[in-house]
Every structure is written in structure tokens, then in C-alpha cells.
Amino acid sequence: MKKILAALLVSFALLSCKDEKKQEKDLLNEVIKVHDQVMEKDQLIMTNKMQLDTLMQQNKDPQLNNEAKKLSAQLDSADARMEDWMHKFDAENKGKSHQQIMDYLSAQKSTIEAIDKQFNTTIATSSAFVKQNKSK
């Protein structure tokens, strides 16, 4: 009877370890998926920055140039935030408990989702500005 109970406990422990590793891997994959979506938009950041720079060179309107500079700074800020996140992100999580890993990855997912939102907002705003002022 004791052997059966011991075997059940060992089986349960092994299954729960596999389940924890799967949870960690699934959450990591979610973080990476959002990261990849943001990286796809990085080229739009650079394109919009170049278009804003061109607008500033072609126009002498100080109000338009000030707005273009502000939007360019927002694009730089979004890009810098992404770079900073990538440099600090640790996908390995060695020596941490399951709960610590899940907490870390959850926080990282929230951060990268906020960066994605910032990318979307700055790209949309700067694209609309460029489109509106291209012919001026």
C-alpha cells in the first residue's frame, strides 16, 4: 500500500512539474508573440521619422515644424522603450521558482503590450500628420 501511495505521489509530482513548465512556456510564447508584432512595426517608426524629417526640411512654417519635432520625439521614445525592453528581457529565468517565472513573464507581457499600444498610437498619429501635411 505504501509503495502504491509513493508511486502516486511521484507520478503527481512529475505531472505537476510538466504542467508548470508548459504554463511557463505558453506564457513566454505569448510574450514573444507580442514582441514579434511590435518588431514588425519598427520599420514604420523609421519610415515615419524620415517623412517627418523631410516635412521639416521642406516647410518653413514654425508651427508645423514644432508639431513634426514633437511627433518625431514620440517615435524616438517608442523605439527607445522597445530597445530598452529587449535589452533587459530575460527569457531564461534560471534559478527561479515557477511562481517567480510566471510573475516575471506576466509583468513582461504587460510591459510589451503597453509598448505595442505606444507604437500603434505614435505610428497612427504621425502617419495622419504626414498625410495631412504632405502637400503643404
Predicted regions and their residues:
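Long, amphipathic, charge-rich alpha-helical segments that form helical bundles/coiled-coils
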Residues: 68-112
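Short, charged/polar, low-complexity loop and linker segments
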Residues: 21-24, 54-64, 95-103
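C-terminal amphipathic alpha-helix
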Residues: 34, 38-39, 97, 101-136
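Short, low-complexity, disordered segments immediately C-terminal to signal peptides
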Residues: 18-34
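Post-signal-peptide N-terminal segment of Sec-exported extracytoplasmic proteins
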Residues: 34-76, 80, 125
